[in-house]
């Protein structure tokens, strides 16, 4: 009898912890529980009820949401919605302003998250993975007529309100067709209601858009975390192992001892000198189908004016008198081949050449030809 009471107490405690989010657990407690690798009882019906994969034919407006939204969602979920629309149409996703999942760990959505993927015949592009409570995910427009939404929660802590995503056709809106509800109000169609939202362009991850996204990262570690949050450390290590004879060829000029008198004279007479200049690699190399990290590099380029304050100085231009090419080692991507797991073959360290101006001359139209 005592054994039965003990088992009932454990089951009750485990089930109630799924709903209680009033207290914020300490990070140490979280790690301890995760390391213990505790599992829910397989007899718990929620485990089977919420492990689903559903295909939705998008003919109008509707939504998908986490179970029990806007309350705490259950644990141990793996839900997938595959949205399909007619050919020559696209699908728009808009997140409800009430959004909250378990917080990220080290800025990585590792445990509870919602993920959106663009699906085509040739590739799958992850549009984003979100968790936490800080901000609502952006509006998303699919590249094709297919898009996939995945929601995952682990065996431990849950949060509320979860999420709700409204979907709609971008073109040729038709009256919403009724769809079957497969589980506990997780999926629903909005019948007789026109769901309109502002037309905001959501750039897909083509080269130009990815180039802008890369601008948000300060380190290559942050960049790899974005592409592969689960395997970025392995990608970072393999980046150098893939090159059998890795040898960086980047170099910089040696600087001679500064001559203050000469600098002062140059400022008065010829401020046309090589100086640091930031160039966008894609623009500099005229490559439109690849992106680089870092996006920009410092080079020496001629700048300033000529003979500032002297006669005819406005008619002079500062041009390169000697140009050399220098090697720079960067990380190169081909966006169409980026994969979620593992490092794509088209992501590699490469050497590029950029022009550096070593000497600058003033060319003045008033000066007679030499």
UniProtKB/Swiss-Prot annotation:
PANTHER family: PLATELET-DERIVED GROWTH FACTOR, PLATELET-DERIVED GROWTH FACTOR D. Belongs to the PDGF/VEGF growth factor family. This is Platelet-derived growth factor D. SUPFAM superfamilies: Cystine-knot cytokines, Spermadhesin, CUB domain. Pfam families: CUB (PF00431), PDGF (PF00341). The gene is PDGFD. The lineage of its organism: Eukaryota, Metazoa, Chordata, Craniata, Vertebrata. GO terms for molecular function: growth factor activity; platelet-derived growth factor receptor binding. Its main location: secreted. SMART domains: CUB (SM00042). Homodimer; disulfide-linked. Interacts with PDGFRB homodimers, and with heterodimers formed by PDGFRA and PDGFRB. The record marks 247-250 as: Cleavage.
């Amino acid at each position: 009898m005592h054994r039965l009471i003990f088992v009932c107490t454990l089951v009750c405690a485990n089930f109630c912890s799924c709903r209680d989010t009033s207290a914020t657990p300490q990070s140490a407690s979280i790690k301890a529980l995760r390391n213990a690798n505790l599992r829910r009882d397989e007899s718990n019906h929620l485990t089977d009820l919420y492990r689903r994969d559903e295909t939705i034919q998008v003919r109008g407006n509707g939504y998908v949401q986490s179970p029990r939204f806007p309350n705490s969602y259950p644990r141990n979920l793996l839900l997938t919605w595959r949205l399909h629309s007619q050919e020559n149409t696209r699908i728009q996703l808009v997140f409800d302003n009430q959004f909250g999942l378990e917080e990220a760990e080290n800025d990585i959505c590792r445990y509870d998250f919602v993920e959106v993927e663009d699906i085509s015949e040739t590739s799958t592009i992850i549009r984003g993975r979100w968790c936490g409570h800080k901000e609502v995910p952006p509006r998303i427009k699919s590249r094709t007529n297919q898009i996939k939404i995945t929601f995952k929660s682990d065996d431990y802590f849950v949060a509320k309100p979860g999420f709700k995503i409204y979907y709609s056709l971008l073109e040729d809106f038709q009256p919403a067709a009724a769809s079957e509800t497969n589980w506990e109000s997780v999926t629903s169609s909005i019948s007789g209601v026109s769901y309109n939202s502002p037309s905001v362009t959501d750039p897909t991850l083509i080269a130009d858009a990815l180039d802008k996204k890369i601008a948000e990262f300060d380190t290559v570690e942050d960049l790899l975390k974005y592409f592969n949050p689960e395997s970025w450390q392995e990608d970072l290590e393999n980046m150098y192992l893939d090159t059998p004879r890795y040898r960086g060829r980047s170099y910089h000029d040696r600087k001679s001892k500064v001559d203050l008198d000469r600098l002062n004279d140059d400022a008065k007479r010829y401020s046309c000198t090589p100086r640091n200049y930031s160039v966008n690699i894609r623009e500099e190399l005229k490559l439109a189908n690849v992106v680089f990290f870092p996006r920009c590099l410092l080079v020496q380029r001629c700048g300033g004016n000529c003979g500032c304050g002297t006669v005819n100085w406005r008619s002079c231009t500062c041009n390169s008198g000697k140009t050399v090419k220098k090697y720079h080692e960067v990380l190169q991507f081909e966006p169409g081949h980026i994969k979620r797991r593992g490092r794509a073959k088209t992501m590699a360290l490469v050497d590029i050449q950029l022009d550096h101006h070593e000497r600058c001359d003033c060319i003045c139209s008033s000066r007679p030809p030499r």
